[in-house]
């Protein structure tokens, strides 16, 4: 049976220099919003990770996930993404196991290998090690969550006769996702039997992943495909969208800087090819329903999250839109897709 459609929010907890709101208030309002998201019956809360930025971008999702687990009862908690090369895999396995118990089995983990050179330099790691660190890390996480003693000897990590406790609530541990911008990362997600967080061009990531999953004897429709595709519901876009659009230009500029310091070609992002859409959908309920339904159907998306805050603006500024999204947009999207409309 294909996975159910899920919707939610994603947060990065940042306050750019000169913002009207400081980081303590960003965290406080985001937590209040996440409680609202849980009460509204949305399905997901995701977090991003980056390091050494003057806007305070969330560097570690673990404490925040613990706070969310303690104040919610429904939403599933995950990352888009956890930068696995910068984490000790055994410690991360322990953290996720504790979080899975704390949340009653609501944890998932989206994994990426990173690309920004300044982050690898900051952790004293050669960027050339990122593939092996991710691939060994995935193997170690799964061994650690097996509930059995394990040993591992690899290129980067070497452990002997370890038992990781507590056991996660979910058998085998929190579900894993792999993020991908290239055909190589799509192949990695298929090979390690994970869900997919695609970015970049469809024919570089999404289509090769589906083909490789099928080659391995599995059905790609049994897996989840998740993406950040934000939706701002308003009856007056000219009035309400302007401050958020201005703030979002800051986020785009930060990622452009990351790509500019990257020594290799990542994907369509820097070659000007058309990527899987991740821009905002802005408009009234009918417009948002139509655009989101078409997007989900065209790309086979199962999980959609919208930004819970624009950089430098209070998370509370998004709450009215989120309420309409949950109450007026999501039910119609679900109904339309299930009916084949």
Regions found by a protein language model. Name each.
Residues 1-76, 172-174:
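N-terminal beta1-alpha1-beta2 module of alpha/beta enzyme domains
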Residues 2-5, 85-192, 202-207, 211-222:
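Internal, glycine-rich beta/alpha segment that forms the wall or movable "lid"
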Residues 3, 11, 39, 129-164, ...:
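An alpha-helical appendage that flanks or caps ligand/catalytic pockets
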Residues 7-11, 45-47, 77-79, 107-111, ...:
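Hydrophobic faces of well-ordered beta-strands that scaffold small-molecule active sites
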Residues 24-36, 95, 180-187, 287-294:
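Short, acidic/polar
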Residues 72-74, 103, 188-197, 300:
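Glycine-enriched alpha-helix->loop->beta-strand junction motifs that scaffold or abut catalytic
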């Amino acid at each position: 049976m294909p996975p159910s459609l899920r919707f939610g929010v994603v947060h990065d907890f940042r306050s750019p220099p000169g913002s009207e709101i400081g980081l303590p208030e960003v965290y406080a309002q985001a937590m209040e919003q996440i409680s609202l998201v849980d009460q509204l019956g949305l399905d997901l809360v995701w977090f991003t990770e980056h390091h050494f930025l003057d806007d305070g971008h969330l560097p570690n999702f673990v404490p925040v996930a613990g706070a969310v687990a303690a104040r919610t009862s429904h939403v599933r908690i995950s990352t888009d993404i956890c930068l696995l090369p910068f984490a000790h895999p055994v410690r991360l396995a322990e953290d996720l196991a504790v979080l899975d118990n704390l949340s009653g089995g609501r944890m998932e983990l989206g994994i990426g290998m990173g690309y920004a050179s300044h982050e690898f330099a900051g952790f004293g790691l050669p960027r050339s090690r990122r593939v092996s660190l991710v691939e060994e890390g995935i193997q170690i996480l799964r061994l650690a969550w097996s509930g059995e003693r394990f040993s591992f000897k690899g290129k980067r990590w070497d452990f002997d006769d370890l038992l990781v406790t507590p056991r996660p609530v979910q058998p085998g541990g929190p579900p894993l996702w792999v993020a991908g911008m290239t055909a190589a990362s799509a192949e990695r997600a298929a090979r390690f039997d994970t869900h997919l967080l695609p970015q970049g061009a469809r024919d570089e990531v999404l289509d090769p992943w589906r083909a490789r999953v099928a080659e391995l004897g599995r059905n790609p429709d049994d897996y989840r495909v998740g993406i950040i595709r934000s939706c701002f519901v308003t009856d007056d876009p000219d009035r309400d969208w302007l401050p958020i659009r201005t703030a979002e230009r800051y986020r785009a500029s930060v990622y452009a800087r990351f790509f500019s310091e990257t020594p290799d070609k990542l994907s369509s992002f820097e070659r000007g090819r058309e990527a899987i859409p991740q821009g905002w959908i802005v408009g009234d309920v009918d417009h948002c329903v139509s655009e989101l339904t078409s997007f989900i159907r065209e790309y086979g998306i199962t999980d959609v999250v919208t930004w819970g805050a624009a950089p430098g603006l209070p998370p509370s500024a998004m709450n009215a839109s989120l309420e309409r999204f949950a109450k007026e947009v999501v039910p119609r999207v679900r109904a339309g897709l299930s009916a084949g409309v």
